[in-house]
Amino acid sequence: MIVRMWHGRVPAGKAAQYRTFLNARAIPDYRSVAGNEAVYILERHDGDVTHFITMTFWHDEAAIRAFAGDDLTRAKYYAEDKEFLLEFEPRVVHYEAVGSVADSAPQ
């Protein structure tokens, strides 16, 4: 399984709106792609900036390609992101999941 990680920063005053957007728009988009196994959105407040990380779990590179296109590590953005993000990081990072244990998904 491949874990795809993206990082973005928003002004702290827009964090709640961006969280709502990610849950309403981005998560359903990820989940609509065959081979997407899970999505987690992480959030960390740091003064006047809030950091978001999306961790998406994919069956294989073919599934990522169906979502992101042929350039597998190129970040994918939505038109609405321009209302929130402080910059547009061009790349994501992929990791191979090599171990796990979970009783249930975080709520």
Regions found by a protein language model. Name each.
Residues 24-36, 57-94:
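An amphipathic, aromatic/His-enriched active-site/gating alpha helix that lines ligand/cofactor pockets
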Residues 4-36:
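N-terminal first-folded block
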Residues 2-9, 38-70:
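Short, well-ordered beta-strand segments in beta-rich or mixed alpha/beta enzyme
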Residues 2, 37-50, 76-107:
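Glycine-rich beta-strand-turn "strand-cap" elements at beta-sheet edges
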Residues 16, 62-64, 100:
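Residue-level signal for secondary-structure boundary sites
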Residues 12, 60, 96-99:
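Non-catalytic surface loops within mature trypsin-like serine protease
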